[in-house]
Amino acid sequence: MNDYLQTNARYWSGTYNAPNVESFIFRFYGRILKFDYGIDGSGHERLLDFGCGQGAALAFFDNLGFDCFGVDIAANDIAVARSRMPHIASHFAVIDPKPNPEQIFFGGNFDIVISIQTLDFLSNTDFDLAIKCLYNNMKVGSKIYASMNGWAHYYRNHATYVGDGLWHVQFKTDRLDYDLYLNFVRDKEEMAKKFSLFRPVYLDYYDYSFREEGSELRYTFFGVKE
């Protein structure tokens, strides 16, 4: 398990084309940021995507007027994001797989932080380091929206628990060939504990299933730094 970060980094070093913003991102914008808080991008709020991939979510927010920044461990994905948004190419950075709670991204002081399907690639210990890092990058009153794998996620059916919150997922189908480490959250109560640095506003979830492969349940946390 000691080299789990390298195993996961190898997984992300492959090509994963994801050009479109996901529904759980644009609905978060419309139903929470805009509806609840009147945040629509017109104020050019500073937004960080921790685990931005190829920048699909940031392209959506950039088009709305947000001042967007993204970090990821996958250099190939950061290169795609920079080529996709050359006007903010300097707003993307490759980071080390090992979280550093003292690291400040692009001067910090962010109004909004999102981290979708990223933090669940970390052990409990490294998750805590990453959350402290994000907390330190946010201003008082800023918002965070993040997801974690749910306990019912079908990947866990193909996994062995190895400690510190991590499950070693290994399986191969006609579509997938997985050898990686993931963290799964039992319920909303555990989700709240993991994000206890923030005041919780909404603890929720999203799920989908295709080809009858199984549930891909993820819990979501939306909260505020006080």
Question: Residue spans of the language-model regions?
Answer:
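Class I (Rossmann-like) S-adenosyl-L-methionine-dependent methyltransferase catalytic domain
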Residues: 1-44, 53-102, 145-226
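A conserved beta-strand element that flanks and buttresses the S-adenosyl-L-methionine
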Residues: 114
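A short glycine-rich, Lys/Arg-flanked "PGG" loop and its adjoining helix->strand segment in the class I
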Residues: 128-140
